[in-house]
Regions:
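N-terminal secretory signal peptides that target proteins for export/translocation
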Residues: 1-8
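Bacterial N-terminal signal peptides
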Residues: 12-23
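N-terminal leader/targeting segments and the immediate start of mature chains
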Residues: 17, 26-82, 90, 226-238
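An acidic-aromatic
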Residues: 86-138, 204-205
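Gly/Pro-enriched, hydrophobic low-complexity segments
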Residues: 128, 149-238
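Short, solvent-exposed helix-to-loop capping segments enriched in aromatics
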Residues: 58, 136-151
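Extracytoplasmic
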Residues: 61-63, 82-84, 90-92, 105-107, ...
């Protein structure tokens, strides 16, 4: 169970990549026919170097609020977890990610406050905290910083059209990253789906709804104070 929680947490960090896409309310229905990253070539694949929907959006997102559904499968395609959650982002470098599993469990909360990354496991009454630069250095969440050269950290390639969506493949440039690739599906300038794969072959499929882009986010929504009585592991950066 604890291992599954950390899978959700790690995939939650990857999901922050999606906040750099173009958003509107609504989401496409899940499909088992999304393009394989190894098939991102051919007649339907635009030339590498052509600006993607993800490229076009990176410059103008300030805040985002959305709910999402996430399905986690193992390397054999078997479903091992299904959950719903909420995501709030304030660029640069702040977000709140909360997820509630289907069935038992009270869920987890992850907050980046600009200095530290906090992870609250309500079932264990435990908080883990790390400096944000160390915690996110090898994840797509670096895209939140707004200060890095995205093309140096991630390779973004048009991956063709399928199921009515234009797909963008995102791959880490460095070997130290703990994920293999992310596929983002766009309908015009609207991000509809995201598929994430880690180095163990586990895959998360994410769809989004009730999305508000560049709306107001109160400071306390991307801040964290440990609840009374919980164990705190780690030392926050002041």
């Amino acid at each position: 169970m604890q291992r599954l929680k950390w899978r959700r947490a790690r995939l939650g960090l990857w999901a922050i990549v999606a906040v750099c896409g173009v958003w509107t309310a609504g989401a496409a229905s899940p499909s088992n026919t999304a393009p394989d990253a190894n098939q991102a070539t051919g007649a339907n694949a635009p030339a590498v170097g052509k600006p993607t929907p993800l490229d076009r959006y990176l410059d103008d997102m300030r805040t985002l609020r959305a709910t999402f559904q996430q399905t986690l499968t193992d390397a054999h395609g078997r479903e091992i977890d299904r959950a719903r959650g909420t995501l709030i982002v304030v660029r640069p470098g702040k977000f709140s990610w909360e997820i509630h599993p289907q069935g038992n469990g009270t869920g987890q909360l992850m907050v980046a406050d600009g200095r530290n990354l906090w992870f609250l496991d309500r079932d264990l009454q435990q908080v883990t905290v790390k400096p944000i630069d160390a915690a996110l250095s090898a994840t797509p969440a670096m895209l939140l910083s707004g200060t890095i050269d995205v093309r140096r950290s991630f390779k973004m390639t048009p991956a063709g059209k399928r199921d009515g969506l234009d797909w963008v493949l995102v791959e880490p440039q460095g070997a130290e990253a703990d994920f293999r690739r992310a596929l983002l599906g766009f309908d015009g300038d609207e991000l509809k789906r995201m598929i994430l794969e880690d180095k163990l072959g586990q895959t998360a499929s994410v769809i989004f709804d009730h999305v508000e882009r560049n709306g107001h986010v109160a400071p306390e929504e991307v801040a964290f104070v440990p609840p009374p009585g919980v164990d705190v592991i780690g030392t926050p950066r002041k």
